[in-house]
Curated annotation (Swiss-Prot):
It is found in: Golgi apparatus, trans-Golgi network; Membrane, Coated pit. It comes from the Eukaryota. One of its GO terms (cellular component) is clathrin adaptor complex. Residues 184-450 form the MHD domain. This is AP-4 complex subunit mu. InterPro entries: Adaptor_comp_med_subunit, AP2_Mu_C_sf, AP_mu_sigma_su, Clathrin_mu, Longin-like_dom_sf, MHD. Its main location: Golgi. Subunit of novel type of clathrin- or non-clathrin-associated protein coat involved in targeting proteins from the trans-Golgi network (TGN) to the endosomal-lysosomal system. The gene is AP4M.
């Protein structure tokens, strides 16, 4: 795989990092890319796809905490490989800097360029391993003080669990010591699940899937061996059980369709007691990736009704009910619903006492948007929208509106019930007792309700 250029742009289009490896693509590619992304309106889509071609140049990009990580090339390369490379470069830089934002990039541009020159040579990838790079990187990171950091959604998804973990968990460099030269011995394990659910217009589940990963980030000196135990009732493959029954709270076992492990993981006792053994490499890495298609109880139930209210009017009612326990809080919830193309105006009515909620009608793409700051488990929220049309509608209005889609983050909650039962670290001495942090988070990948 070969790329010509790599660069990082801010949300404003400012060029933060730029490296031209092969001099095959015009120097103005950064401006071409940003202009294309900012004003993308092809095929009715508001956002540019991760891959597109302009004047014979292929542009690949991923957006990480508000920054565009971009690669360009004129040759035909595997899109999935380039997108994975961009994600890994972002992860390596985050491992070294502790946090990804403009400030940390600008304070550490010498280190960032040193990393890029080791990761990619003349357009060819050499390594994306933080552990391997430590032997070749000699610049020390300038760690940005946590007080200077602005809250960023993807990096702050665990803040709801502050009582369980330190607030600086996601802002530490794996190579820089804490002030005073001492390094705090600790390890973080994150169980992150992205769920995809499609509801029928009657509220029944049509498709459901979980893409999960167990991420580990180690700040342990000496690379001690770690044993990580999962549910004893974990099964790989469906084992002939029905895939249409909800699992009860008592549990009938966790059934994964398939999974794969990091190369450092040893599976000697996995079949007998579901224990993983490994010596963690430096940096953040996925211990295990897994997929589950057995039907599960979705965290939110969405009911939507749209009906005519006159020749040029209609009313929409969207009701959301949280199906998780009351001690769990979901945050950064966004509900979107495409409206008929001839919608000219929308007025909204929220329930009495509604707080932390915003509504908007995006006229450019005829989109209804409802943002909620948080939803407590067991809570129910309703939005009413009155639509005004510029012309009479003919036929069934439900065929010209929807579906309703949701995005959300639920800290300290996972729908698959996969759990880390214990995290054991080989002791160097009787007084060695590093901090262990285990965190769970559920996010929406594709959460859609038809109307």
């Amino acid at each position: 795989m070969m790329i010509s250029q790599f660069f990082v742009l801010s949300q404003r289009g400012d060029n933060i990092v730029f490296r031209d490896y092969r001099a095959e693509v015009p120097k103005g590619s950064t401006e071409t890319f940003f202009r294309k992304v900012k004003f993308w309106k092809e095929d009715g889509n508001a956002e540019a796809p991760p891959i597109f071609n302009v004047d014979g140049v292929n542009y690949f990009h991923v957006k990480v905490v508000g920054l565009y990580f971009v690669a360009t090339t004129r040759v035909n390369v595997s899109p999935s490989l380039v997108l994975e490379l961009l994600q890994r470069i972002a992860r390596v830089i985050k491992d070294y800097l502790g946090v990804l934002n403009e400030d940390s990039f600008r304070k550490n541009f010498v280190l960032v360029y040193e990393l890029l020159d080791e990761v990619i040579d003349f357009g060819y990838v050499q390594t994306t391993s933080t552990e391997v790079l430590k032997s070749y990187i000699f610049n020390e990171p300038i760690v940005v003080s946590p007080a200077r950091l602005q809250p960023i959604d993807p990096a702050a998804i665990f803040t709801q669990g502050a009582k369980r973990m330190p607030g600086t968990a996601v802002t530490k460099s794996v190579v820089a010591n804490d002030p005073g030269g001492r390094r705090r011995e600790e390890i973080f394990v994150d169980i992150i699940e992205k769920i995809s659910v499609t509801f029928s217009s009657s509220g029944y589940i049509l498709t459901s899937e979980i893409d999960g990963t167990i991420q580990m980030k180690s700040y342990l000196s000496g690379n001690p061996e770690i044993r990580l135990a999962l549910n004893e009732d974990l099964n790989i493959g469906r084992g002939g059980r029905s895939v249409y029954d909800y699992r009860s709270s008592s549990g009938s076992g966790v059934i994964l369709d398939d999974c794969n492990f990091h190369e450092s993981v040893r599976l000697d006792s996995f079949d007998s007691d579901r224990t993983l053994s490994l010596v963690p490499p430096d940096g953040e890495f996925p211990v295990m990736n897994y997929r589950m298609t057995q039907e599960f109880k979705p965290p939110f139930h969405v009911n939507t009704l749209i009906e005519e209210a006159g020749r040029l009017k209609a009313e929409v009612i969207i009701k959301i009910r949280a199906e998780f326990p009351s001690d769990i809080i979901a945050n950064t919830i966004t509900v979107q619903m495409p409206l008929p193309n001839y919608t000219s105006r929308a007025s909204f009515e929220l329930e009495p006492g509604a707080a932390g909620q915003r509504t908007d009608f995006k006229e450019s793409n005829k989109m209804l948007e409802w943002n909620l700051k948080k939803i407590v488990g067991g809570g129910e929220h309703t939005l009413r929208a009155k639509l005004t049309f510029s012309q009479e509608f003919h036929g069934n209005i439900t065929k010209e509106a929807g579906p309703v889609s949701m995005t959300f983050t639920i800290p300290m909650y996972n729908v698959s019930k996969l759990q880390v039962k214990y995290l054991q670290i080989a002791k160097k001495s009787s007084s060695y007792n590093p901090y262990r942090w285990v965190r769970y988070v559920t996010q929406a990948n594709s959460y859609v309700a038809r109307i």
